[in-house]
A protein has these predicted regions:
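The conserved acidic donor/metal-binding loop of glycosyltransferases
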Residues: 31-35
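Acidic donor-binding segment of Leloir-type glycosyltransferases
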Residues: 1-3
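Structural signal for membrane-spanning alpha-helices in multi-pass inner-membrane proteins
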Residues: 81, 160-163
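Short aromatic/hydrophobic "clamp" motif used to bind/position activated sugar donors
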Residues: 27
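Conserved alpha/beta core of the MobA/IspD/sugar-nucleotide pyrophosphorylase nucleotidyltransferase superfamily
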Residues: 128-131
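Alpha-helical bilayer-embedded segments of polytopic membrane proteins, i.e.
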Residues: 162-176
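Acceptor/aglycone-binding surface of glycosyltransferases and processive sugar-polymer synthases
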Residues: 5-7, 11-21, 38-119, 136-155
Length: 176
C-alpha cells in the first residue's frame, strides 16, 4: 500500500510514515533511484530472519559516484562510526532491512534518516549487520547532495549522539 504526500516532505518523513504504516515482521527500505538492486533484498531478509540481526545496512563498497561525493561520504561515515561506536562502513545506504520492532521503536524527523542505525542502537537494538551491495549508476532522479547537507550533517550527528547518551537524563551532560 502506498502513501502519497501533498508535497515532498523529505526522506525522513517518508521513512517515518512508512515505518508507522508497516505491518510485516521484516521491513525493507530502498531508494527509488534504483542505485541499489532489488535483487539484494532476499539476502538482507535472510540476515534478519535467520541470522537474527535487528538491522542490516547495505554497504556500497565500490561506488560509482564522482570524487566530490565520495570524499565527503567517507568523512561522514568515519565520523558516524566514531560518534555511534557502530562498525558500519556505509550509514547512508538506502537499502536496509529491519525487524518490525526496530522501526516501531524509533521516530525519524528532520534529516535523521542518515542516522537510523544510531537511532536503533540508542533504542536498544545492538545487533546491527552490514552486507556489501552492488552500487549502480542512478537511473531516476537527481542527487540531493550539496553544501547544505555537508554543513548540517555534522550538527545532526552531534544531536543524535547527544540524544543517545543523554536523551533520558539531559542534565547529566552538565554533571547533575
Amino acid at each position: 500500500k502506498g502513501v502519497k504526500f501533498r508535497r515532498n516532505y523529505g526522506k525522513s518523513a517518508a521513512l517515518n510514515i512508512g515505518f508507522l504504516k508497516s505491518k510485516g515482521d521484516v521491513v525493507i527500505t530502498m531508494d527509488a533511484d534504483l542505485q541499489d538492486s532489488p535483487e539484494e533484498i532476499p539476502e538482507l531478509y535472510k540476515m534478519i530472519t535467520e541470522d537474527n540481526f535487528d538491522l542490516v545496512s547495505g554497504w556500497k563498497q565500490k561506488r560509482y559516484d564522482p570524487f566530490t561525493k565520495t570524499i565527503p561520504t567517507k568523512l561522514f561515515n568515519w565520523a558516524a562510526r566514531k560518534a555511534s561506536s557502530i562498525k558500519l562502513n556505509d550509514f547512508n545506504c538506502g537499502l536496509k532491512a529491519y525487524k518490525r520492532v526496530v522501526v516501531k521503536s524509533i521516530e525519524i524527523y528532520g534529516d535523521m534518516h542518515r542516522y537510523v542505525p544510531a537511532l536503533a542502537k540508542y533504542a536498544g537494538f545492538t545487533n546491527i549487520g552490514e552486507k556489501v551491495v552492488q552500487h549502480q549508476a542512478r537511473k531516476y532522479g537527481v542527487t540531493k547532495f550539496g553544501l547544505n547537507r555537508f554543513l548540517n550533517g555534522p550538527l545532526d550527528l552531534i544531536t543524535v549522539a547527544f540524544m543517545g547518551k543523554f536523551g533520558k537524563k539531559p542534565m547529566h551532560f552538565f554533571g547533575a
